[in-house]
């Protein structure tokens, strides 16, 4: 088992894949930070995030601050992590928090940065008609998906693939790339390179009202919108 202490931050199933990979690889996940339980589904029943459920299965301490940079810094510091990992956490990290892990914070982002920065990269890649996408591990800084790139891996977008289906494949790919990244960082041989700002694209977070399809578009545009909005907010 590695002696590396890792604090993990993530919320949906995409993040759970990376957490499971770290546990299976024998890393010491000293704590998990995830979003608070929230109402979900048509009945609005309060449900825990997938990352929380997985952490509890493995007996890992769980923290659910509404804003980690305001309410979770002390808990985070007490864990004394060597490294932090984020995967679809859903919160912005303060510089105070980023300065705590001696090896920094690695983010597992579901696009080939610097393209598709932001919180909904999979959906937008499909809606923009991309035929290839991938995952990037990057060193988190105070910006939004602006840190140095560590490793990347690509995959093809399958014909007719929805955002939900593609997210599952990217989650598995991201978990594999994360393990390669953590191992390289642990042994001090993980090169990093700055993002090329000239190639940057940033897309907004999806909102429920975006699920309304513009039927005046071409057949291809409508099909891409439908695929990109499934399973939510379509």
Where are the language model's segments positioned?
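Internal anion-binding site segments
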Residues: 2, 197-234
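N-terminal glycine-/serine-/threonine-rich beta1-alpha1-beta2 phosphate-ribose binding loop
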Residues: 35, 39-82
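N-terminal Rossmann-like dinucleotide-binding module
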Residues: 1-43
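Short beta->alpha connector loops
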Residues: 11-14, 66-69, 89-91
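Conserved beta-strand segments of alpha/beta enzyme cores
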Residues: 28, 59-61, 104
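Amphipathic, non-transmembrane alpha-helical secondary structure
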Residues: 16, 20-24, 73-77, 179
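Donor/substrate-binding cores of folate-linked one-carbon enzymes
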Residues: 25, 35, 83-202
